[in-house]
Amino acid sequence: APPRPPVTTVAAAAPGTPVPADRRLHWGPPTLAAGVLALAAARPIGDNSFLTHLATGRVLLDRGWPQGNPFLASAPDDFPIPSWWWSGLLAVAEQVAGHAGIRLLTVALAALLGVLVVRLAAGRDGLVASVLPPAVAVLVLLPFVTPRPHLAGFLLLGVALVVRGERRRWWWLIPVFATWVNVHGTWLYGLVVLGLVAGADLLDGPHGRRRSGLRRDAALLGGAVLGVAVGGALYPERFRLVGLPLEQLGGGAAREVIRAYNEWRPVGPASAVFWTLVLLGAAAAGGAVWRRRPGAFLAAVLLCGMGLSAQRLVPVAAISLVPLAASTLDGLGTIPAPSGRAARTLGAVGAVLVALALLAAVRGPHLDHERFPVAAVDRLEARGLVADPDVSVVHQDFVGNYLEWRYGTDAHAYVDDRPDLDTAVDYVDLVRLRPNWERVLERADAQVVLWERDHPLDRALAEAPSWRRVEVVDGFSIWCSEGVSACR
């Protein structure tokens, strides 16, 4: 049997001790990772959720804290506004440099994320341990580096894992989690990840190290929880954000609605990220078996399962698996990590990619509105049938995001990607064309329906005598109910 190497996933140095020169991270591989993610982040912005976050930031800068949701006609007055720090940051970037400023911000954060991902495997011996886990994680992250608030969440997760892996002081996690609570809801999974890796080390560590490791992880978790409390207190409605995950996931109806959104659906084998995440999880689990570390094996399986349970959790799992896989694969194989000329070459390539990403972000085009009904909304605007509080327009969620970006607080949107529960339940009934779809339209007092052509609801409206298709524009049908004079 192979010798059993040290099992701890963190460096053995005391907190605050400088990392030895031979364990420091060469600038080449992290620069390459930064360049790859930066270039992916430089593509024109076509994300629907970003539009609402930017619109929210504009409201925060122009009018201050709004009373309730400022965009949805259906939202209750006490509706919370999550990710408000991120929304404000987007609006500031827009004021400074327009949409180019937002893209530059996205590129910079994506590049920093690439550096952090590679740093999570720093100091491991061999190419397999130091390169394979971060390389696979970067592949997983490619579709997710968009100007949504989850980008800041991924970055803060990386910082939290670096704090633990490099044995930084526990109080570092206070500002990390205080910020995290106000930028993205993945802070809850950050606590879960810290607990999982702490449990793995407790189970696998030699008896003499368990007590000291337990004290350190308890301090880190305490700092994280304290940071959550501080962040919750900074929200204008004290601690509302801390309880928001329970509001969203607490009831059966809420869970059913959430599962209707693509980002909360399980990841299947038809998706490329399924296999890349499975590869990373298998590497971590296989290394744990080789090292006879049941705790690390269990953590790898649980993290991989968490990521596959919902698309939005895939990046969280991938980032979390990097230090675990690097530790279990440490010393495997005879090929050394890149150094010398090879590392310098990787760094040069990465620097070129970063430069190309910055150039693309500045030059444009900045926005990609191909999936949105721009022309159809133009037609509705010409008829006076949109952005009017006296006209109820029912539409799909991503259309609501576009209306909020285009019209701001005058959007009077029916739904977006963060509606209240009652509206979300009704919206799912429309999307799935449940038998009560006509009652849903009645509850919304719908006068106009703007929906994708050939969707089940579009076909159902074609058979409904009280609805008339006015026109089809770029794949979207405009429907009007009886009595709407502007549609005649």
Residue spans for each PLM region:
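Short periplasmic/luminal acceptor-recognition loop of GT-C membrane glycosyltransferases, typified by
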Residues: L385-A424, E442, A446-R453, W479
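Periplasmic/luminal catalytic loop of GT-C fold multi-pass membrane glycosyltransferases
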Residues: D426-E482
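Transmembrane catalytic cores of multi-pass membrane glycosyltransferases
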Residues: P44-I45, S49, L61-P66, A75, ...
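Specific aromatic-rich, kink-prone transmembrane helix
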Residues: L116, A137-V140, A152-R167, G195-A198, ...
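Membrane-interface alpha helices of multi-pass inner-membrane proteins
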Residues: L37, A137-L141, G158-V163, W170-G185, ...
